[in-house]
Structures are given as structure tokens and as C-alpha cells.
From Swiss-Prot:
One CC-aspect GO term: mRNA cleavage and polyadenylation specificity factor complex
Single Gene Ontology BP annotation: tRNA processing
Organism: Schizosaccharomyces pombe (strain 972 / ATCC 24843)
Entry function: Component of the cleavage and polyadenylation factor (CPF) complex, which plays a key role in polyadenylation-dependent pre-mRNA 3'-end formation and cooperates with cleavage factors including the CFIA complex and NAB4/CFIB.
Protein name: mRNA cleavage and polyadenylation specificity factor complex subunit pta1
Family: To yeast PTA1.
Pfam families: SYMPK_PTA1_N (PF11935)
């Protein structure tokens, strides 16, 4: 084509791309019509086509099914574009292949007769991996991303069909007896690819860009393929940055690169420690790795700020007096020159070894935690109590002196060139005396005698009125039942109903099963079942208790959807029945002065629940039959309710089936 004709053609292609940007759903139709553009000899067509394919397949607005069909159609074109000797074209093709590979892989899994497509896909994969092995630097980052997509595809994913999404393509999609896809070979290849990307971390050259690219894909691999977590975490823990102190001629740029990689590595390890795929042993190893620091050499201060090049005048600052300097030296004993002591500010407070002490150069982190714990406990049992308290007081005073430095008010050397009008600050004699006394007490190993701590007491809260208590209680119960629709289905599963008690409730998890225990207990034993009786009251009809309020709220909830709350109703009525039996068998427990028992509650609320159920019964409602058989007691009034069901022409069969069921499986029923 002539130059003018090529430019005109590219202009029309750009217009087509603008249309796709406006409405990305048109991408499949347009790309099929212009796919032959990639065969033109002009390199500008190939660049445009590679970029357009990458743009279209990376769009989230194109449906997955359309991408799946289009990926197979464009596969040959993508392979031909990757053969072009142009870095820009290859980068776009590799980026496009990150989306193409899992799509074509899924097509091959569901099409056992299309082996030619699988061969073409394998050819594309091998060519990209070969460029990675050659160390083609302009393409290396794109190759790392593509290899991560291949690993995700060739490793088994989530097998539960309820959790997996259709866009998550993994080795689990491959049928057991596939004619040309061997799952074992692909899985071994995925493990080899993991070793390939980790080879960048362990290479001799320190390239921040490539190492960061590898580190950034690792959390994605662990999140989507949890079985890779042990291998990835283990390889990361074997990675150690070079020590800048060992490389005397290390440039500032290399030192900054090490700091950048160290920061990124720490973030990645912390993220992996919080991920669900990491085991407890892996988490412990990660924390031990981080606590030991990646390298123990402090980076030069020249990397943080530029040094002042001018001459520093002696008159620009005041020099500390010898008395102040000697006091600081006594309060901060000389530390070892070990790198760990210099880098860790906490060690500078707690450690008191001198530089010549051999313990200063001993790495405590090399001792296992169990052995260190046993040593500490044994030492604490055998140490002299007075000496122990003396050291504690010294440590307490050292921490206080470092965290709250006080002005000692000692003489300071004033430069001769200082302004004659300068007036020194007033000396606080009390502050000096307190500081001197604390220093003397520290040296004697005893705490200061005049340290007075003011006792602090919280004010007694005002007592709430009965109406205020009722209002707050109503608000708490209302918030609880606002979340009731989230419970869904059964509040308590039948398998856990017998063994679920307040004693074996796990405090770390508070869910619908625990509310099923708490609410019935609030009605019966959790809240007071007694109502204060005034001298003018003769009956309890006008009285109102908190337990009756909970019963009303609970009844309103279960009546709205009784089928999904059957177990909760049975649990509640069983608690009411048990409480009534205890109260009736022990009449002395409710004969206290100024209190009155509300009376039996089981039959009252059981009848209310049954009345709310009856209008919603069906002709063959087996849930009702099982519910009646599980009631703790069948009173005459409850049996009359079943008789009422027998009199209903639409539910006669249900009523007699219920009686038959009770006679067969509930022998005590009359």
C-alpha cells in the first residue's frame, strides 16, 4: 500500500477503535471483520492490531462467552503477531495472551476433538517462556505476568461448584480421561514455572523492577491457589538481601534498591501471614523471619538527607555541661557495638551489657522459643528477690528518664559572642531535687520515697428509673431482632440442639445458634420473673416485666416465619416448660416479700404459637406433625387445637395423621 493509503486506512481503524471504546459490546463483531489487518506487511498495522486485541480482551464489559468464542478465532492471529520482531508488538501480544490462555484452555477442556487448537496454544506458551529464559529485558515483566496466569490455569482450583466462578479456569476443569490434555504433566510444568520466577530473586543481579514484579504476583497466586502457599512462603523465607556492609563499594543507588526491596518483601510476607492459605507453622516462620530483620546494617544517613557542606560555627549551638553529660552516661550504660543493638531502640533501653561482655555478641534469636521460655522461667524462680526488684527499679527509672527528660538546671557554657541581653531561664529547684533524688534512689536500688500517686475513682453512675431501664432494654432487643432476617433458615440445627448449652458456647464466635440459647433463657432465667407488687395492686394483670416483653418480641419473630424457626420455638417452649416445673415443685422460691410470680407460661405461649400456625397449614404439612411431637408436654388445650384441625375440611387428613403420629411415636400421649 502507498503511504497515503496506509494513513487513511489507519484513520478508519482508529475510528473503529473509538466506536469500541464507546460501546465495548461491539468488540466481537468488529474484530472479526478486521482480523485480516494483522496480515498486512506494514508494521504499523501489526502494532495497531496487537494493541486493539489487548484492549478488547481486557475489557470487563465484553461477556465471558463472547470472549471464549473470540479467543479461539483470534489464536492463530496472535501467534503470527508474536513472530514479528518488534518489542512493542510482542508486549501487547503477551498482555493479550494473559487473557487468551485460560479461555482457550477452557475451550480445549470442553472440546476433546480440537487438538489443533491445543497445539497452537502450547506453541504460543513455549515461545513466551523461551523469551523469559533468554532474559529478554524489555519483555521480562510481561513474561512474568503471563507465567503467573499459566500457573493459575495449570494448578487445581476450587472444586466446589457453588464457590467457583466461570471465569476462574484451572486444572480442575480438565476431565479425567481427556485425550490430549495430561493433568499431571501440566501440574509439573506449573511447579517448574514457579521455580523459574523465583530464579529472578536468587539471581546475582539486583534489579528492583523485576524483583518487585515477582513479589507482586505472589499474593495473587496464594489467594487463588491456596495449595501453593507453603511452596511460595518457603521460597520467600530462603530469600535474603545482600548486606550492604559486606559490599564496601556498593553505590547509593544499590543501597536504595535494597531498602525498596526490603520494604516490599516485608509487606508481602505480612500479607501472606494474614491470608487463609498460610498454615500456623508458616505464620510463625514469617514472624521469626521479620523479627530477625532482613539485614542488620543501618543504611547510611547520606541516603536520608544531604549533609550540610558549610562550616559549622562553634557559636551556633550550646554545648552540654560535663555534669549533664556524666549523668546521661550513667543513665544510659555503654552498649555493645553489635549491629542488632544499634538498630533496635528497645534493646538500647533494656540491654545493659558493656562492649567487652561476650553476651553482647550472642544472637538470642537463634535459641528456640521453647528452650528460651524454660530458661527464663527457671531463672525467675532462682533469682534473688531483692536483686530482681533492684534491677526492675533501675529499668523503670531508665525508661522514665528517656521518655520524660527533665531539665536539670545545671550551669551551661555560654559563648562569648552571645548577646549580652540574654537572660537564662529560671531554675526550678523542686525539679532539680526530684531528679537528684530519683538518681540516688536508682543507684541505691530502691524506688523514690516521695513518689505520690493520686487515687482516681470513677464517679458513681446515677440510678436509672424503671421507665429508662425499659426504654434501653427495648432498644437493645429491637436492634437484635433487626438482624433476625439475616439468620435465615433454622436458628439451631437439629444435630447441635441437644449438645448446645451456655457452658460450651465458643466466645470467639457469636452467631445465630448462640442467640437461640440466650433468648429463651432471658425469658425464663436470665431476667427476673418477678414483678414488684405495690400495696395497691391485687392482681398481676396490670404489671409488666422485662421477661414478658422478651416473650412478646420472640413470639412476633417466630410467628412471622414459623417454618424456619421451628427449632427456636421448641427450644423456647422447652425452657418455659422446665421453668414452670421448677417453680411449681419449689413453691418456697416465690414467696418472698413484695414479689409475685407471673404464673405458668408454657401452655399460654404454646397455644399462642399454635394459633399463629394454624392459618398457614397445608394439607400435607409434615413439619406441623413433627413440631407437635417435639413439644415437651401435650396438655388438654393443645390436644383440643389438634382436634380443631380435624374439623377443618381442608385439613382433616392432616389432623388425623398428626394424632396417628403422636400415638405411634409419643406413647405418653393420651
Amino acid at each position: 500500500m502507498e503511504v497515503s493509503e496506509t494513513d487513511e486506512h489507519l484513520t478508519r481503524l482508529n475510528q473503529a477503535r473509538d466506536i469500541v471504546k464507546t460501546d465495548q459490546s461491539l468488540f466481537p463483531e468488529i474484530v472479526r471483520n478486521i482480523l485480516s489487518v494483522a496480515n498486512y506487511s506494514d508494521i504499523r498495522y501489526k502494532k495497531w492490531m496487537a494493541n486493539f486485541l489487548w484492549f478488547g480482551f481486557s475489557s470487563k464489559n465484553v461477556k465471558f462467552e463472547q470472549k471464549l468464542d473470540l479467543a479461539v478465532t483470534c489464536l492463530d492471529t496472535i501467534v503470527s503477531l508474536y513472530a514479528v520482531d518488534n518489542e512493542e508488538v510482542k508486549k501487547d501480544v503477551i498482555s493479550c495472551s494473559c487473557t487468551i490462555y485460560p479461555l482457550v484452555f477452557l475451550h480445549c477442556c470442553t472440546s476433546p476433538n480440537d487438538s489443533s487448537t491445543w497445539d497452537t496454544l502450547t506453541k504460543l506458551k513455549n515461545e513466551i517462556i523461551n523469551d523469559f529464559d533468554k532474559g529478554n529485558k524489555p519483555l521480562l515483566i510481561s513474561c512474568i505476568k503471563f507465567i503467573s496466569c499459566v500457573i493459575l490455569t495449570q494448578v487445581p482450583g476450587i472444586r466446589d461448584p457453588r464457590l467457583v466462578t466461570k471465569s476462574d479456569v484451572s486444572l480442575s476443569k480438565v476431565p479425567t480421561h481427556h485425550p490430549f490434555i495430561n493433568s499431571n504433566i501440566l501440574r509439573i510444568e506449573a511447579n517448574d514455572l514457579i521455580e523459574k520466577i523465583f530464579s529472578i530473586l536468587f539471581s546475582d543481579s539486583l534489579n528492583v523492577l523485576y524483583i518487585t514484579s515477582v513479589l507482586n504476583i505472589l499474593p495473587v497466586l496464594v489467594k487463588r491457589r491456596k495449595e501453593l502457599a507453603p511452596k511460595i512462603i518457603g521460597s520467600l523465607l530462603e530469600f535474603h538481601l545482600p548486606n550492604p556492609k559486606d559490599e564496601i563499594e556498593l553505590s547509593n543507588e544499590s543501597k536504595l534498591a535494597i531498602r525498596c526491596i526490603e520494604k516490599n518483601l516485608k509487606l508481602i510476607l505480612l500479607h501472606l501471614a494474614k491470608s487463609t492459605g498460610a498454615s500456623s507453622s508458616s505464620v510463625e516462620k514469617i514472624h521469626a523471619y521479620l523479627s530477625g530483620q532482613i539485614y542488620h546494617t543501618k543504611v547510611d544517613e547520606s541516603l536520608k538527607k544531604r549533609q550540610y557542606e558549610g562550616n559549622i560555627s562553634a557559636a551556633s549551638k550550646r554545648v552540654k555541661s560535663s555534669a549533664v553529660q556524666s549523668l546521661v552516661e550513667r543513665m544510659q550504660p555503654q552498649l555493645s557495638s553489635h549491629d542488632g543493638l544499634q538498630n533496635n531502640p528497645l534493646i538500647s533501653i533494656f540491654a545493659s551489657q558493656t562492649a567487652i561482655n561476650p553476651l553482647a555478641n550472642f544472637d538470642v534469636t537463634s535459641i528456640p522459643v521453647e528452650v528460651a521460655t524454660e530458661i527464663v522461667l527457671t531463672s525467675l524462680l532462682k533469682i534473688d528477690k531483692n536483686y530482681f526488684h533492684q534491677q526492675i527499679n533501675m529499668l523503670r527509672e531508665r525508661v522514665r528518664s528517656l521518655s520524660e527528660p527533665e531539665s536539670l538546671g545545671l550551669d551551661q557554657q555560654v559563648d562569648e559572642d552571645e548577646d549580652e541581653d540574654y537572660e537564662p531561664p529560671e531554675v526550678d529547684v523542686q525539679t532539680i531535687n526530684a531528679s537528684v533524688e530519683r538518681e540516688a534512689a536508682r543507684l541505691e536500688g530502691s524506688a523514690p520515697s516521695n513518689v505520690v500517686t493520686d487515687a482516681f475513682e470513677l464517679p458513681t453512675p446515677d440510678s436509672l428509673s424503671p421507665m429508662a431501664i425499659l426504654e434501653y432494654f427495648h432498644g437493645a432487643l429491637s436492634r437484635l431482632f433487626d438482624y433476625a432476617p439475616q439468620f435465615e433458615r433454622s436458628i439451631v440445627s437439629s444435630s447441635n440442639l441437644q449438645n448446645l448449652t451456655l457452658e460450651n458456647v465458643d466466645n470467639t464466635v457469636w452467631d445465630k445458634r448462640h442467640w437461640a440459647i440466650l433468648l429463651p433463657r432471658l425469658c425464663t432465667r436470665g431476667l427476673l420473673n418477678y414483678q414488684p407488687v405495690t400495696s395497691g395492686e391485687e392482681s398481676g394483670d396490670a404489671s409488666f416485666t422485662l421477661s414478658s416483653f422478651v416473650r412478646g418480641q420472640l413470639f412476633t419473630y417466630v410467628a412471622s416465619n414459623w417454618r424456619s424457626s421451628t427449632n427456636l420455638i421448641l427450644n423456647w417452649l422447652s425452657e418455659e416448660w422446665y421453668n414452670d416445673r421448677l417453680m411449681l415443685e419449689n413453691p418456697d422460691c416465690h414467696e418472698y416479700e413484695d414479689v409475685k410470680w407471673e404464673g405458668p407460661q408454657y401452655e399460654k405461649w404454646a397455644l399462642k404459637v399454635i394459633d399463629s400456625i394454624l392459618p398457614y397449614l397445608e394439607a400435607k404439612d409434615k413439619v406441623f406433625m413433627i413440631f407437635m411431637s417435639e413439644l415437651p408436654e401435650l396438655t388438654d388445650a393443645i390436644v383440643d387445637k389438634i382436634k380443631f384441625v380435624c374439623l377443618d375440611p381442608d385439613k382433616t387428613k392432616l389432623g388425623f395423621m398428626t394424632f396417628q403420629y403422636l400415638i405411634m411415636f409419643r406413647l405418653t400421649c393420651t
